[in-house]
A protein has these predicted regions:
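Membrane-interface extramembranous regions
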Residues: 1-142
Length: 142
């Protein structure tokens, strides 16, 4: 269980930090502005994506509802796949479009470890609930 927690926190920290940094770069870097033009995206999309990345990074590290967390993972997966497709479509070299796919793997590792933590937490709460029921059942039966 400790190994899963460490894996989850490290991988999730990497994703959250990378998304926060890239959002900052999207908002401040002229080089990133030029890259979005190169990819054929309008300027406002860069800003929307930066805001979405900041919100998503917060949702990954904050204690939010499981559905919110899962939608955040789905959104980031779409971002990484779309980034790879955009770079491939514009003829960028493999070194450019491989990076989002590597982060997709890191995201997948974070998601799998998150699911394992959720299932172990669920099992613990059911075991505690189950023992409470049996004690109640025993007291009623007596």
């Amino acid at each position: 269980m400790k190994k899963i927690k460490i894996t989850y926190y490290v991988l999730t920290g990497i994703i959250a930090a990378m998304m926060t940094y890239s959002a900052y770069a999207y908002l401040t870097s002229d080089q990133v502005k030029q890259a979005f033009v190169h990819l054929g995206f309008p300027g406002y999309f860069r800003i929307e994506l930066a805001v979405a990345k900041l919100i998503g990074a917060a949702m990954l590290v904050l204690p939010v509802a499981q559905k919110v967390k899962e939608w955040t993972y789905a959104g980031f997966a779409i971002v990484f796949v779309s980034a790879a497709v955009a770079h491939i479509s514009s003829g960028d070299p493999a070194s450019v479009f491989i990076a989002p796919l590597i982060f997709l793997l890191v995201l997948a590792g974070s998601y799998v470890s998150y699911q394992k933590l959720q299932s172990s937490t669920f099992e613990k709460s059911n075991n505690n609930l189950g023992s409470g029921r049996s004690a109640l059942s025993e007291s009623i039966a007596a």
